[in-house]
Structures are given as C-alpha cells and as structure tokens.
Amino acid sequence: MPKIKTSRVKYPEGWELIEPTLRDLEAKMREAENDPHDGKRKCEALWPIFRISHQKSRYIYDLYYRRKEISKELYEFCLDQGHADKNLIAKWKKPGYERLCCLRCIQTRDHNFATTCVCRVPKHLREEKVIECVHCGCRGCASGD
C-alpha cells in the first residue's frame, strides 16, 4: 500500500518554546498588513511590515547563533517554513552587515549612482541629523553606529 501523505507538519523538539513569540509576531504582521495607510506616503505603509519581518528574523538568529537555545534542526525548520528571512540572516553573519535592516538597503540597483542606502552611512559621517530610509524607515543600520 502506498503511504498516505498528510498535510500535518511535524514540529521539531523545542518548537513549543518559540511558538508563542512567533505567533505574537505573526499577529502583529497581520495587523500591520490590514492597517489603513491614509495620510501616509506609499513607501511609509510598508515600514511596519519590514520592521516586524526584521524582528522575527533577528529573534530566530539570536536564539540560534548568540544564545544557542535552539537546535540546528529547529533553526532550519524555521527558515524552511518562512518564519525568518534566510538571506538576511546570511548577511548578518558577514562582517559589516551585523545590524543590516533589510536587503533592499544594500541592493545598488534601487539607488541613485549605484550606491547603498543612506541608512548604511555611519552617523558621524552624515550631514543631516535625522534621516530615514525610503525603503524600510530605518534610521541607521551601519555597523559602526
């Protein structure tokens, strides 16, 4: 007899420890997606979504690499299920990108003169005091800040 495939996902050991936090962040994400954006610029409507996505990825990254509280199996499960952005986490592992806010800020095709975003400039080199990234609303994610 052929095996019957079920749609039920087997969660790895330790999932019950991180599930409440991920559920809270998912609820915040749904709320941010459904939030009306009256009076905001087109790009400002996406800023809360980018922040929550960054927060979820940073939570899983910190649990695995910094605090070492979750197993590799659980970490890879979270990446495969889309609970964290694996490309952003891959950049966080590289020197100079430890505090990167989003991947759009380092893509040169989205910026004038093929450079990176203004939030990647260290604070002591900026001419203006308060500046926000157009893509995600970040105020500064350079490693030297």
UniProtKB/Swiss-Prot annotation:
Transmembrane parts of this sequence: none
InterPro entries: BUD31, BUD31/G10-rel_CS
GO cellular component: spliceosomal complex
UniProt keyword Nucleus, yes or no: yes
Compartments it resides in: Nucleus
Biological process according to GO: mRNA splicing, via spliceosome
PROSITE patterns in the cross-refs: G10_1, G10_2
Major localization listed first in the record, in broad terms: nucleus
Family statement drawn from the similarity comment of this UniProt entry: Belongs to the BUD31 (G10) family.
Full protein name: Protein BUD31 homolog 2
The species this protein was found in: Oryza sativa subsp. japonica (Rice)
Lineage of origin: Eukaryota, Viridiplantae, Streptophyta, Embryophyta, Tracheophyta
